[in-house]
A protein has these predicted regions:
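S-adenosyl-L-methionine
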Residues: 1-71, 88, 96-117
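Amphipathic alpha-helical interface surfaces
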Residues: 54, 79-82, 102, 106
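Conserved class I S-adenosyl-L-methionine
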Residues: 67-78, 94
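Conserved SAM-binding loop of SAM-dependent methyltransferases across substrates and taxa
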Residues: 79-91
């Protein structure tokens, strides 16, 4: 990769490693190197079925006996899987993600999940 005249030129070898955000019918994805990364809560649905959610280690660790309105802060939200499990267990969850690309992927996953309700 060379920078010239305030533009970045990609050499052929750099193009194979380049990543980009792309939106398609399945939502927003980070695509590059023949792989894609997207938030998708549908794969977590079996884990929140009745009787299974209470056995999730994260939920068990976060529960506070006698707390009727639990609130969790997910300071490393990533794609939101932990937040999803806690919300399904009845927690109010505040999510924070420092990487704007990962935050955008998580926001897209949340928006798509809310559209399925």
């Amino acid at each position: 990769m060379r920078k010239s005249n305030q533009q970045i030129e990609l050499a052929e070898s750099d193009e194979a490693c380049a990543t980009s955000l792309q939106r398609d019918e399945r939502g927003l994805a980070l695509v590059g190197g023949g792989m894609e990364l997207r938030g998708d809560f549908s794969q977590l649905l079996p884990r929140i079925r009745k009787g299974r959610l209470a056995s999730e280690l994260l939920v068990r660790a976060a529960k506070v006996r006698g707390c009727t309105e639990p609130w969790a802060i997910d300071a490393t939200a990533g794609l939101g899987e932990d937040s999803f499990l806690l919300a399904a267990a009845g927690f109010r969850v505040s999510m924070y993600e420092s990487d704007p690309i990962i935050a955008a992927l998580a926001r897209d996953a949340i928006d798509r999940a809310q559209g399925l309700q």
